From Swiss-Prot:
Pfam families tied to this protein: HGTP_anticodon, tRNA-synt_His
Location(s), subcellular: Cytoplasm
Superkingdom of this protein's organism: Bacteria
Name of the protein in its database record: Histidine--tRNA ligase
PROSITE patterns hit by this protein: AA_TRNA_LIGASE_II
Recorded name of the encoding gene: hisS
UniProt feature coiled coil, ranges: none
Organism: Paraburkholderia phymatum (strain DSM 17167 / CIP 108236 / LMG 21445 / STM815) (Burkholderia phymatum)
C-alpha cells in the first residue's frame, strides 16, 4: 500500500462504541430532559465522577469473582507512574468512593444521581455495547425499606413520563451476610449432586460465587436452579421484616411485582433488596433497569458503616424501547431561517439574527456552502429542509425600504392556510415573529 493510500484510508470507529448522530441526538435529549426532570422532583442531586478510576476500586467493590472483573473490564497500566487503571464498567463504586473521599455524608444522608458512559469489554450485540450509557441513583445513608420503595417508584414514574408500558418489576431479598453463608452451604451441597448438568461457567462459579449459578441462561440448568434451595427461606426476622415492608409500600402505591427467588444480580456488594425492571420486547437483553441495597459497600471501600441503595438503567435499551413502541418524538427544527442576498443584506441579516436570538428564538442564518452568493430559491429550499417555522428574507429592496420579508413555512393561522410572503418593518420584526410563533404553537395544540 502506497503512502498516499495510507493517508486516504477511511477510518472507522471501534466496534461496540457507537456515534450518536444529529438525527438520533434529539431522542437522547428527550430522554435526558425527561429523566432529569423526574430526578429533580425527588430531590436528587447530580454527581459527576471521572471515567477512569483505580482498578482496585472495582476489584474490591464489585468483587474479584464477578464476570465484570474477571472478563469485562478495560484495564491498563499507566505508563507515566505504573498505576493500574480501569475505564469504569459501572458507577456505584465510583460514587461511593467520591462520597468517602470528600466526606459528603458528614451532615447527613445524600440522594445522588449520575449519567454518562460506561465501558465493558464484551461481544457487542443488540442492547449490549462496549461503550454504553447509564443513568443511575444512589441513596446514601438510608437504611429502611421506604428508600428501597422510593427508588423503585422513581422508575415507575419515569416509565409513565416516557409513555412506556409492559415493563415488569421483579424483586427478591438476598438477606444479610450470615443468612447468605448458611444458604451457600446448602446450595453448594445441592449443586454438587448435579455436577453432570453443570456447564463450565457453573462449575467455575460453584465454589466462588454459587449464587450466580441460579441466574443461568442455560435451559438445561434452569430446572436445576428452579429446584435449588431458595435464599428467601433462610431469611431471619430482620431481613424478612425489611422485605415485607418493601412489599407493603409497593402494594399501597399500586406497583405490581413478582418475587423472583433466582434474582441475585451480578455484583457482590448487594444485600437485602434487589430488583430488576424487565421487558420481553428486547429479546435476550430484557433488563432495562436494576438495583438494590448495598449496605456493606461504603465500609468495604474505606468509609464508616453506612446503609445505601440505588439503581442504574441502560439508556440505549430505553431508547430501543421507545422506538419499539413508536414513542420517538419528532426532531424539532429551528424557529427562523434568515435568507439574504447582497452585502448590505448580509450585514443586516447578522443583526436581525442576533436580535431574534436575544428573545429566545432558535435561528439559522444562511451561510453559503461554496462561498459564492446563493439564489433565494436555493436558500428557501434550505430553509424548508431546516424545519424552520418561518423564513426571514432580506434583499436589496428590503434593505432600501427598512423592511423584511416573512414567509410561513408551515401551515398556521398566521399564513391563513397559504404561504404568501408578508412585508414587515424591521423595527416590528421581532414582535411580529414572537406573536407568529405563539400563534403557530397554539395551532399545534388544538
Amino acid at each position: 500500500m502506497t503512502e498516499q493510500k495510507k493517508r486516504l484510508e477511511k477510518l472507522s470507529g471501534v466496534k461496540g462504541m457507537n456515534d450518536i448522530l444529529p438525527q438520533d441526538a434529539g431522542l437522547w435529549e428527550f430522554f435526558e430532559t425527561t429523566v432529569k426532570s423526574m430526578l429533580r422532583s425527588y430531590g436528587y442531586q447530580n454527581i459527576r465522577t471521572p471515567i477512569v478510576e483505580h482498578t482496585q476500586l472495582f476489584t474490591r467493590g464489585i468483587g474479584e469473582v464477578t464476570d465484570i472483573v474477571e472478563k469485562e473490564m478495560y484495564s491498563f497500566t499507566d505508563a507515566l507512574n505504573g498505576e493500574n487503571l480501569t475505564m469504569r464498567p459501572e458507577n456505584t463504586a465510583a460514587v461511593v468512593r467520591a462520597s468517602i473521599e470528600h466526606n459528603m455524608l458528614y451532615d447527613g444522608p445524600k440522594r445522588l444521581w449520575y449519567i454518562g458512559p460506561m465501558f465493558r469489554h464484551e461481544r457487542p450485540q443488540r442492547g449490549r455495547y462496549r461503550q454504553f450509557h447509564q443513568v443511575g441513583v444512589e441513596a446514601l445513608g438510608f437504611a429502611g425499606p421506604d428508600t428501597d420503595a422510593e427508588i423503585i417508584l422513581m422508575c415507575q414514574r419515569l416509565w409513565d413520563d416516557l409513555g412506556l408500558t409492559g415493563i415488569k418489576l421483579e424483586i427478591n431479598s438476598l438477606g444479610l451476610a450470615e443468612e447468605r453463608a448458611k444458604h451457600r452451604v446448602e446450595l453448594i451441597a445441592y449443586l454438587e449432586k448435579h455436577m453432570d448438568v453443570l456447564d463450565e461457567d457453573a462449575k467455575r462459579r460453584l465454589y466462588t460465587n454459587p449464587l450466580r449459578v441460579l441466574d443461568t441462561k442455560n435451559p438445561a440448568l434452569q430446572a436445576v436452579a428452579q429446584n435449588a434451595p431458595k435464599l428467601i427461606d433462610f431469611l431471619g426476622d430482620e431481613s424478612r421484616a425489611h422485605f415485607e415492608g418493601l412489599q407493603r409500600i409497593l402494594k399501597a402505591n399500586n406497583i405490581p411485582f413478582t418475587i423472583n427467588p433466582r434474582l441475585v444480580r451480578g455484583l457482590d456488594y448487594y444485600n437485602l433488596t434487589v430488583f430488576e425492571w424487565v421487558t420481553d420486547k428486547l429479546g435476550a437483553q430484557g433488563t432495562v433497569a436494576a438495583g438494590g441495597r448495598y449496605d456493606p459497600l461504603i465500609e468495604q471501600l474505606g468509609g464508616k458503616p453506612t446503609a445505601a441503595c440505588g439503581w442504574a438503567m441502560g439508556i440505549e435499551r430505553i431508547l430501543e424501547l421507545l422506538k419499539e413502541e413508536n414513542l420517538v418524538p419528532e426532531n424539532e427544527g429551528c424557529d427562523v431561517y434568515v435568507a439574504h442576498q447582497g452585502e448590505a443584506a448580509r450585514d443586516q441579516a447578522f443583526i436581525v439574527a442576533e436580535r431574534l436570538r436575544d428573545t429566545g428564538l432558535d435561528v439559522i442564518l444562511h451561510c453559503s456552502p461554496d462561498g459564492q452568493a446563493s439564489s433565494f430559491k436555493s436558500q428557501m429550499k434550505r430553509a424548508d429542509a431546516s424545519g424552520a417555522a418561518f423564513a426571514v428574507i432580506l434583499g436589496e429592496d428590503e434593505i432600501a425600504n427598512g423592511t423584511a420579508g416573512v414567509k410561513a413555512l408551515r401551515d398556521s393561522s398566521q399564513s391563513n392556510g397559504k404561504s404568501e410572503q408578508q412585508t414587515v418593518p424591521l423595527e416590528d420584526l421581532t414582535e411580529y415573529l414572537i406573536n407568529a410563533m405563539v400563534a403557530s404553537t397554539e395551532d399545534g395544540d388544538d
